[in-house]
């Protein structure tokens, strides 16, 4: 442990620089993408039923995204990385496991 009189250099890391980028408690890009899809549905169909359906679907998806972000705020990035590495790391064990 460093003593109070030591010459260690300390740097402040601001909380905003290390926090994940969330909007309404969910991943920002996914919330905006689902909002865009709901708005497109509402303005293309132009009925009250489409408006209610679009808002309901958006609220359900945002709830699911908030649950996902509560488990891991970076889950979208982890999943995209998992998909890109899927060819290199198989889900099966190696044939040399028994040795």
Swiss-Prot record:
How does it sit in the bilayer?
Single-pass membrane protein
UniProt keyword terms in alphabetical order? Cell membrane, Conjugation, Membrane, Plasmid, Transmembrane, Transmembrane helix
Q: Which InterPro entries match?
A: Conjugal_tfr_TrbD (IPR016704), T4SS_VirB3/TrbD/AvhB (IPR007792)
Stretches that traverse the bilayer: 40-60
Asked whether the keyword ATP-binding is assigned, the reply is no
Q: Which domain of life is it from?
A: Bacteria
Listed under GO cellular component are: plasma membrane
Matching Pfam families: VirB3
Main subcellular location of this protein, as a coarse class: membrane
Q: Where in the cell is it found?
A: Cell membrane
Q: Does the keyword Membrane apply?
A: yes
Give the similarity note: Belongs to the TrbD family.
Name recorded for this polypeptide: Conjugal transfer protein TrbD
Q: Which organism is it from?
A: Rhizobium radiobacter (Agrobacterium tumefaciens)
């Amino acid at each position: 442990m460093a003593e109070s009189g030591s010459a260690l250099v300390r740097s402040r890391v601001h909380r905003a620089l290390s926090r994940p980028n969330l909007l309404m408690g969910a991943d920002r890009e996914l919330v905006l993408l689902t909002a865009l899809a709901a708005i497109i549905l509402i303005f293309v169909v132009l009925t009250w039923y489409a408006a209610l359906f679009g808002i309901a679907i958006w609220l359900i998806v945002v709830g699911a995204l908030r649950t996902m972000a509560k488990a891991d705020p970076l889950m979208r990035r982890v999943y995209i990385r998992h998909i890109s590495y899927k060819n290199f790391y198989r889900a099966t064990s190696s044939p040399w496991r028994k040795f």
